Amino acid sequence: MLSGGEVDRKRVGEIVFADRGELAWLEALLHPRVVDEQARWRTEQTAPLAVVEVPLLYETGGEARFDAVVVITASEEVRRARTEVADIMERQGRLLSDDEKAGKADFVYVNDGSLEDLDAFVRSVVQRLAP
């Protein structure tokens, strides 16, 4: 799995997404470390607003660590066009639905438009959140 100090992410994905026990083991190993690293990083920030991307935020109960949550999603067609993962539906099957995430979020954006549209959304969120 390790080659020259690098992780073969594709192979790890094949293993853990084929065996829920292996996935649980990996998540139990990684998630506490990621949370600790995010907390350390946040203490170092001096800007009035800091952004953290957390792919499994709601699934891991992590939303309580943040003042606001922004959910950015896209239609299934757009997701398929943007990903190289062949078994995306298997992986998405363990996630909350977009509707559930949107219902919990403070801000929601469906990213099916242009980069300019996304930039405008981000600017509007920053304007509302920045002191």
Predicted regions and their residues:
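ATP-dependent small-molecule kinase phosphotransfer cores
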Residues: 1-49
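Short beta->alpha linker loops
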Residues: 7, 29-30, 74, 96, ...
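Short alpha-helical
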Residues: 21, 33, 77-78, 96, ...
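Residue-level signal for inorganic ion chemistry
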Residues: 26, 51, 109, 118
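ATP-dependent NMP and nucleoside kinases share a basic, alpha-helical "lid"
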Residues: 35-44, 49-82
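C-terminal non-catalytic interaction appendages of large macromolecular assemblies
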Residues: 75, 87-102, 121
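Phosphate-binding beta-loop-alpha motif at adenosine-nucleotide cofactor sites
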Residues: 103-117
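C-terminal alpha-helix
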Residues: 124-131
